[in-house]
Amino acid sequence: MAVAVGRPSNEELRNLSLSGHVGFDSLPDQLVNKSTSQGFCFNILCVGETGIGKSTLMDTLFNTKFESDPATHNEPGVRLKARSYELQESNVRLKLTIVDTVGFGDQINKDDSYKPIVEYIDAQFEAYLQEELKIKRSLFNYHDTRIHACLYFIAPTGHSLKSLDLVTMKKLDSKVNIIPIIAKADTIAKNELHKFKSKIMSELVSNGVQIYQFPTDEETVAEINATMSVHLPFAVVGSTEEVKIGNKMAKARQYPWGVVQVENENHCDFVKLREMLIRVNMEDLREQTHTRHYELYRRCKLEEMGFKDTDPDSKPFSLQETYEAKRNEFLGELQKKEEEMRQMFVMRVKEKEAELKEAEKELHEKFDLLKRTHQEEKKKVEDKKKELEEEVNNFQKKKAAAQLLQSQAQQSGAQQTKKDKDKKN
């Protein structure tokens, strides 16, 4: 029996003053210390065509050299390759995972290029959900692999988005925080770049693609996020090479016509991307992944399993009520299955009995047939035996008669010989 427990409303809360220092003002410091000791994780998905500069931009963003294999255009399909790294800046540790889409856009038929990406994102959500559903959970030590940010690299065509880009972003926008960027922006003239940006944003809106919105509800970041949002998609240039500019060395790309400085905001939007992705909104990206994208996946999965927050009449359902309903449903299904199996067993037994009776009948018929055949054969043998015995008797009689005649003939011959001798004498 469920017992309703009342919750205090905001009107019931009273503000009280303290007569002395208690110490809970140290809670923010406690949280910071705990988070610092645990470290942080951040997972970036880089989606873009082969050779568009994904690896170079990652190296430039984090000011290090990550491992990367030379890319080819001969991949039979799209595959995702994830690599994790431990980074440390001051006393803050970051477990960074970079996921690359190898072979994206290289196939002739690109209709299903987005599927491996969607499957990978869902697989990370599923792994986290399975950990959450365990009786003994260990989320504290769990390596969270859910994607927090998707950097979508757009080829610098200067015209419009490719259909592959629109389809892929539309499939991903409900699963991940998409940040569109124009790669190799130094290949487009400035006036064309502004038009290209406007065209991209217009196409995203008209096709209903939801990209990541920089938060503007917090005072500390509202102004900078509002300012930076107008520059989307960020036009970036990546480079790990340093070029001497004046008396300083700076990351740049050297061309015959001049130098493109990576961190010069007049040349590209790299600094804006770094500010928005890492320095200002990294925690919001992590939070949005958990509270929005993962929650959507989790809700859909639980609904598939039969767990819902409301009943058919839209009345709230408690977890206990849901459990009882699922338990009763399961027991009903179990009883139904048991009855079906019982009936199936009875039917099989009857079928087997009928088969055995039929086999027994056939055996009796075969036995009777063999018995009759045996009797007939026995009678034939006995008749044949009688015939043989009669033939033997007849033969014996004939033999005796022949012997008698032979004996009489011999006696008659002896008497005749004697008479002949007597006459001569």
Swiss-Prot record:
Q: Where is this region: G4 motif?
A: 183-186
InterPro entries with a match to the protein in the record: G_SEPTIN_dom, P-loop_NTPase, Septin
**What molecular function does GO assign, one term?**
molecular adaptor activity
Q: Which locations, inside or outside the cell, does it occupy?
A: Cytoplasm, Cytoskeleton; Synapse; Cell projection, Dendritic spine; Cell projection, Axon
Q: Where is this region: Disordered?
A: 399-425
> Quaternary structure?
Septins polymerize into heterooligomeric protein complexes that form filaments, and can associate with cellular membranes, actin filaments and microtubules. Forms homooligomers. GTPase activity is required for filament formation. Interacts with SEPTIN7, SEPTIN9 and SEPTIN12.
What protein name does the entry list? Septin-11
Organism of derivation: Bos taurus (Bovine)
Classification from the root reads: Eukaryota, Metazoa, Chordata, Craniata, Vertebrata
